[in-house]
Amino acid sequence: MDIDNPKIPPNSVDSEQSVLGGLLLHNESWDSVVNILSSDDFYQTSHRIIYDAIVTLLEHDKPADILTVKEQVIKSHDEDSIGGFTYLAQIAENTPSVSNIEAYAKHVRELSIYRQLIKIGKEMADTAFSPKDIEVNDLLDLSERKIFEIAEQV
């Protein structure tokens, strides 16, 4: 990475917010998202925390709205870790359309896969630049296995 021109990993704050806002506004949208996303797919740490709180509430058949999510978050995190109640309200207010939540979720997931590929690529490049106790065929096998693990998630 060039210090003068750092590359930001692929992400979309808008898509992440739209997924979260859609879930806050219409809990039934969970059915469209549950098999697409996990909290690890979110780039923003605050969005991971919010998503985990929503999931916890919905899995326990509790409503997930800005108040209940905030209360769930503060059970294990500082409220400031998600930008506070105001940020939750902004997410809900700025959600463009709940009906497109599946498309937003797929976009968030796709960007997550790109980030995973970048991470693996960097790991493989680092290992190839200084191959400590690893044969080239072993590195190829390791690379193939890691990429296959990502492919299985799709």
PLM regions: where:
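Noncatalytic partner-interaction/assembly domains of nucleic-acid and motor enzyme complexes
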Residues: M1-L111
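Extended, charged alpha-helical coiled-coil/arm scaffolds that mediate oligomerization and mechanical coupling
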Residues: T45, I74, F85-Q153
